[in-house]
């Protein structure tokens, strides 16, 4: 999987399935490399990604992010491998610990210490048994990592990081922690871009 320099992060829950597929096809036609979609209280992110992958041919579809409290690590590993095998290695798994109000308030889970909880999750995902047809290439994972400890974990156990809503200074610091060979998929909000189609 080779990411292009520009992708789009968008919530698609307000769109019908047909409109979300049409949106993904438009992005693909415009030359964007990836579509990142979120997971909160709408569609389950892996089923949403499967739909978008099935309706595109070159676009990378990424979970930005899949909440680790929404499923166990074995389920995440199976989904990641299955989606990559089915799509020709076009699925990028973004994982995150989410936020206390969503985890405890909405999902009714106990929110653990973020770095320790994520480490345990990643180790479980790595050890997960998978007996279906494997994807051609090893699937890639990035972490929703903002602080230095989560960025260090991303560098140690994953392919990189997906920081959300951060400054250029943070991006520079994240690159220093991750090193030159890890993915750094930064979400930057566009204030004015001067284009009518986005």
Predicted regions and their residues:
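Active-site-adjacent structural elements that line small-molecule/cofactor binding pockets in enzymes
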Residues: 1-197
